[in-house]
Amino acid sequence: MLTVDHNISQSTIHGLGVFSNEKIAAGQLVWTFSPVVDREVPIEQLLKMPDHVLRMFARHAWYVKERGTFVIGLDGDYFMNHSDEPNLTDDGEHMYAARDIEVGEELTCDYSTVTVVEFDPNKGHAH
């Protein structure tokens, strides 16, 4: 669940992106798991789903290897784009602002640390 006010808009990085509607201070919590807003799905359940659902999870969800689950949010966080110099850091359970973030700035993370399965480092986004 994104803990900051945000909107989904056109991104110069790729497709749509998540943009902050408020100033965010360096170190501020920006994302945390919420069982109300986020869904954690065991891979065994996903493998029973149609291919288009598997593709959606591979492209937009975070894979949690230690638990064998995928996490996908319902608040638009799945539109968050990759950056080699992200403004969010990730400790595996939470995301924090890596630096001060201005109103209107796109929120970005490093897909290689949040484990987006279809991330292509050569393209800089999931495909």
Feature names for model-found ranges:
Residues 1-127:
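Conserved catalytic SET/PR domain of SAM-dependent protein methyltransferases, capturing the structural core
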